[in-house]
Amino acid sequence: MISSEIGGTIEEILVDMGDKVNKGAVLLRLDQREAKLNLEIAQKTLDKNRVQLQEARNNLRRSKDLFEKGIISASERDNIQTQHDIADAQTAQSESALNLAKKKFEDTIVTAPIPGEIKKRHVSKGESIKDKVPL
C-alpha cells in the first residue's frame, strides 16, 4: 500500500490500474504551490540570516580590537559576542527550516517505493488527501 508523507490536493495522477511501475517512478503529484512558497521563504530567511551573521562576525572582530585598545568596555564586547551567538543560532535554525521545507516540497511527488503493478487506486485528481492515507 502506498501513501503520501504529507497531505494536500492531488494535482496529477500519472498511473492507471494495471500499469507496471519501476522503483522511483512518479505516481502522482500534489499541489506544490504552498510547499514551493514555504521553500522560497525558508531560503530567503536563511540568506538574510547569513548576511546578519557575517555582519555580526565583522562586529565581533572589530570589538576585540577595540577592547584590546581600551576603546570599548568588556560589557560592550560581551554584548557584541552575544549578538554574534544569536545570529549564529538563527542561521542554524534557518538551515534546519530550509531542509524541512525542501523535504516537504519533495514529498509533494509520490513515487513507487518498489517495482510492481498498480492494483487499486483509492484517490482521484483534485481530491484532498491526508498524510499516511492509502492512495
Feature map (PLM): residue ranges:
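Short beta-strand-turn/beta-hairpin segments enriched in glycine/proline and small hydrophobics
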Residues: M1-E5, S96-P113
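Conserved strand-loop elements at the edges of beta-sheets that form or border functional pockets
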Residues: I2-S4, R29-Q32, I41, V110-A112, ...
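Surface-exposed patches in structured soluble domains
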Residues: E11-L14, K20-V26, K104, I109-L135
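Structured, soluble extracytoplasmic/luminal domains of envelope-associated proteins
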Residues: D19-L30, E40, Q52
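Short, surface-exposed secondary-structure boundary micro-motifs
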Residues: V26, Q32-R33, R77, P134
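Alpha-helical coiled-coil segments
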Residues: E34-K103, R121
